[in-house]
Swiss-Prot record:
Annotated Gene Ontology cellular component terms: cytoplasm
Record-level Gene Ontology MF annotations: GTP binding; GTPase activity; guanosine tetraphosphate binding; translation elongation factor activity
Key words of the record: Cytoplasm, Elongation factor, GTP-binding, Hydrolase, Magnesium, Metal-binding, Nucleotide-binding, Protein biosynthesis
E.C. code: 3.6.5.3
Domain (tr-type G) ranges: 10-204
This protein's record includes keyword Cell division: no
A biological process term (GO) from this entry: translational elongation
Protein name per UniProt: Elongation factor Tu-B
Family statement: Belongs to the TRAFAC class translation factor GTPase superfamily. Classic translation factor GTPase family. EF-Tu/EF-1A subfamily.
Subunit structure, as described in the record: Monomer.
Binding of GTP, residues: 19-26, 81-85, 136-139
PANTHER family (alphabetical): ELONGATION FACTOR TU, MITOCHONDRIAL, ELONGATION FACTOR TU-RELATED
Length: 394
């Protein structure tokens, strides 16, 4: 097969390996890069290059993550792998590495283990939309019935957390044997790559989604009106279009009468651009930082939601002591802090630094939000936690 040259024109998809410690996530990551490089071109990455993951900071939290890239004939993949369980928890909650799909690695020799379950649950909570299963170490299991049993257990576990367990692709392989160049097991890596291509749909690009701009600043320009500035998070805003100002106070409808970037006038502002948007007839006092400018009807303000949260450890600069129900920190969404109270799950009395926990939050002012929105938890401007909206309640 000819090596095809790498082209930026291929669609790009973000994936990652999840699963229990020592089930072979990093070995599989190395095997994918090695087998695909050999088959389709690209560069292989050795196990130890992936395993000593560099530290990164996301929302003030230190996370160890390895990033690798590989190609199939159809797509370009960016793939994340984390060395430790805590890194996965932090990564998934902060959204440091947003996944369009995940590869759940389960050792056939062990079957599903506690972190297998925890990663599936986290995937559900933080909005990982698709999971593909790689049953690893199958070369070490001679009994076909045992493999059937493990596969069934994994499918049931996925279904328990509202993933389509019965329809999930399950590939039986051996990452180590594939990495060693054994053709029978290399074929299973190609099968996994084909499952990634066919089972994970092409993610919607930010530019194709409804317009949203988190407001960072508000100015009044005499004779022209009010200008709000910020970076367009998604979609496009065109001059002459109606927009809504959502959050904190009652939603207001207005019209975009101008877009400018670097003092130049434009017809539109697009996802990723820092722009100023001129609003017709809107008073300076009607708008504030922390609100969003959005396509009418595309996003609503909410005050109560269920969330999945990671609380920084003392070493990470977090709290030194646990907190209890009735805790009232600030929740930082996009560009502003809003005070809120928390409700802990049944049977959870307190939360220790370094824990992750599911909690219900009640904000004192509404924020424009959808499921999947990330936030920081702060005390007096210092970050003490990170979270994600798992489900809007009201």
């Amino acid at each position: 097969m000819s090596k095809e040259k790498f082209e930026r024109t291929k669609p790009h998809v973000n994936v990652g390996t999840i699963g229990h410690v020592d089930h072979g996530k990093t070995t599989l990551t190395a095997a994918i890069t090695t087998v695909l490089a050999k088959t389709y071109g690209g560069s292989a990455r050795a196990f130890d290059q992936i395993d000593n993951a560099p530290e990164e900071k996301a929302r003030g939290i230190t996370i160890n993550t390895s990033h690798v890239e590989y190609d199939t004939p159809a797509r370009h993949y960016a793939h994340v792998d984390c060395p430790g369980h805590a890194d996965y928890v932090k990564n998934m909650i902060t959204g440091a590495a947003q996944m369009d799909g995940a590869i759940l690695v389960v050792a056939a020799t062990d079957g599903p283990m506690p972190q297998t379950r925890e990663h599936i649950l986290l995937g559900r909570q933080v909005g990982v939309p698709y999971i593909i299963v790689f049953l690893n170490k199958c070369d070490m299991v001679d009994d076909e019935e045992l493999l059937e049993l493990v596969e069934m257990e994994v499918r049931e576990l996925l279904s328990q957390y509202d993933f389509p367990g019965d329809d999930t692709p399950v590939i039986r392989g051996s990452a180590l044997k594939a990495l060693e160049g054994d053709a029978e097991w290399e074929a299973k890596i190609i099968e996994l790559a084909e499952a990634l291509d066919s089972y994970i749909p092409q993610p919607e690009r930010a530019i194709d989604r409804p317009f949203l701009l988190p407001i960072e600043d508000v100015f009044s320009i005499s004779g022209r009106g009010t200008v709000v500035t910020g970076r367009v998070e998604r979609g496009i805003v065109k001059v002459g279009e109606e927009v809504e100002i959502v959050g904190i106070i009652d939603t207001i409808k207005t019209t975009c009468t101008g877009v400018e970037m670097f003092r130049k006038l434009l017809d539109e502002g697009r996802a990723g651009e820092n722009v100023g948007v001129l609003l017709r007839g809107t008073k300076r006092d009607d708008v504030q930082r922390g609100q969003v400018l959005a396509k009418p009807g595309s996003i609503k303000p909410h005050t109560k939601f269920e969330s999945e949260v990671y609380i920084l450890s003392k070493d990470e600069g977090g709290r030194h002591t646990p907190f209890f129900k009735g805790y009232r920190p600030q929740f930082y969404f996009r560009t502003t802090d809003v005070t809120g109270t928390i409700e802990l799950p049944e049977g959870v009395e307190m939360v220790m630094p370094g824990d992750n926990v599911n909690m219900v939050v009640n904000l004192i002012a509404p924020i424009a939000m959808d499921d999947g929105l990330r936030f920081a938890i702060r005390e007096g401007g210092r970050t003490v936690g990170a979270g994600v909206v798992a489900k809007v309640i009201e």
